[in-house]
């Protein structure tokens, strides 16, 4: 997967490209990341990339010229059909389905990281194909949001995770949250690991995990259950969980 990043702070991305699942994907060649700094596409001695907004107001606005030149260079290197994405609190809310769509669209992506009060609206109209948000809150810039998107995409690419099946237990896979997990010791301050997880019966363990994944979803994100059609087994397991939960 080819991925371009337009950012004023390229070194920030060392935090993910050198470590964890993203670093593994980069080292294996599944994810190829290139970065362009808009300051490298300025022609004045101060490398100016921002200016005051017309009409007044607080903050500064990223200028269109350096950003557009950086995007043009990215398209020249990655391909003119690369999809340009602006990470913005005004964008569509990112979810797991869209992560899969972006990761498997066989198209290079260019992530534009805004700073200051935002970017010139004309750049959005001229160059941005999609706007995406990671939540209803504001960050100091688009770099952290881009890292979230990159990490989410990297873990669904082939060869990134050591165990491909681990994706299937992730929260939001098939619109369900994940089940609880436990590790040693078996007992900690009187709290015991559920006996079924110690039984060695994988059929019972899988059934328990499905039951508690559904239960977790019902308690924490009931809105997700409205998006899926439960099987008869899932309905029975969820009913069983509800009865146990409500009875204390």
From Swiss-Prot:
It comes from the Bacteria. Its main location: cytoplasm. It catalyses: guanosine(37) in tRNA + S-adenosyl-L-methionine = N(1)-methylguanosine(37) in tRNA + S-adenosyl-L-homocysteine + H(+). One of its GO terms (molecular function) is tRNA (guanine(37)-N1)-methyltransferase activity. It is found in: Cytoplasm. S-adenosyl-L-methionine binds at residues 114, 134-139. CDD domains: TrmD-like. InterPro entries: Alpha/beta_knot_MTases, tRNA_m1G_MeTrfase_C_sf, tRNA_m1G_MeTrfase_TrmD, tRNA_m1G_MTases_N, tRNA_MeTrfase_TRMD/TRM10. One of its GO terms (cellular component) is cytosol. It is an enzyme of class 2 (transferase). Pfam families: tRNA_m1G_MT. Its EC number is 2.1.1.228. GO terms for biological process: tRNA N1-guanine methylation. SUPFAM superfamilies: alpha/beta knot. Keywords: Cytoplasm, Methyltransferase, S-adenosyl-L-methionine, Transferase, tRNA processing. Belongs to the RNA methyltransferase TrmD family. Homodimer. PANTHER family: TRNA (GUANINE-N(1)-)-METHYLTRANSFERASE. Specifically methylates guanosine-37 in various tRNAs. NCBIfam families: PRK00026.1, trmD. This is tRNA (guanine-N(1)-)-methyltransferase. It comes from Blochmanniella floridana. The lineage of its organism: Bacteria, Pseudomonadati, Pseudomonadota, Gammaproteobacteria, Enterobacterales.
């Amino acid at each position: 997967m080819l991925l371009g990043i337009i950012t004023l702070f390229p070194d920030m991305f060392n935090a993910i490209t050198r470590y964890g699942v993203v670093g593994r994907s980069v080292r294996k060649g599944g994810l190829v990341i290139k970065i362009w700094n808009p300051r490298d596409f300025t022609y004045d001695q101060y490398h100016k990339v921002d200016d005051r907004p017309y009409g007044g107001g607080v903050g500064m606005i990223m200028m269109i010229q350096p950003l557009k030149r950086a995007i043009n260079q990215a398209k020249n290197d990655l391909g003119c059909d690369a999809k340009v994405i602006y990470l913005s609190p005004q964008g569509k809310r990112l979810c797991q389905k869209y992560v899969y769509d972006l990761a498997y669209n066989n198209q290079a992506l260019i992530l534009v990281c805004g700073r200051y009060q935002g970017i010139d609206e004309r750049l959005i109209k001229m160059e941005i194909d999609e706007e995406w948000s990671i939540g209803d809150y504001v960050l100091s810039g688009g770099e952290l949001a881009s890292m979230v998107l990159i990490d989410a995409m990297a873990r669904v690419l082939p060869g990134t995770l050591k165990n491909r099946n681990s994706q299937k237990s992730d929260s939001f896979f098939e619109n369900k949250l994940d089940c609880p997990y436990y590790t040693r010791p078996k007992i900690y301050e009187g709290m015991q690991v559920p006996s079924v997880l110690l039984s060695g019966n994988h059929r019972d363990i899988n059934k328990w995990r499905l039951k508690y994944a559904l239960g977790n979803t019902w308690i924490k994100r009931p809105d997700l259950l409205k998006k899926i059609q439960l099987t008869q087994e899932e309905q029975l397991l969820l009913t069983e969980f509800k009865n146990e939960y409500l009875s204390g």
